Amino acid sequence: MPRICPILDKRPTRGRKIIRKGKAKKKGGIGLHTTGNTPRLFLPNLRNKKVYVPELAKKVSLRISARALKTLMKKGTYTILKEKGLI
């Protein structure tokens, strides 16, 4: 199952985790130094939700991001799902 939100097309993005060592100058140290730079994936916040669609009079099971859930509630479930071709 792909880690993609079907409504907003959010997908995993690549980034890096930067590891720092030392004491900050503001706290009396000589400054932070970067000691590592590890590649990683930032995953979308996907949730399994059952959303009620009044026009169809039934619940639809979706795997959507938390941001997409807010969009559904704001613009209406039927219009968004119809626009994206999910129903």
Swiss-Prot record:
The protein depicted here goes by the name Large ribosomal subunit protein bL28
What family does this chain come from, according to its entry?
Belongs to the bacterial ribosomal protein bL28 family.
A GO CC annotation given for this chain:
ribosome
InterPro entries in the cross-refs? Ribosomal_bL28, Ribosomal_bL28/bL31-like_sf, Ribosomal_bL28_bact-type, Ribosomal_bL28_sf
Q: Which UniProt keywords apply?
A: Ribonucleoprotein, Ribosomal protein
Molecular-function annotations in GO = structural constituent of ribosome
Q: Name one GO biological process term.
A: translation
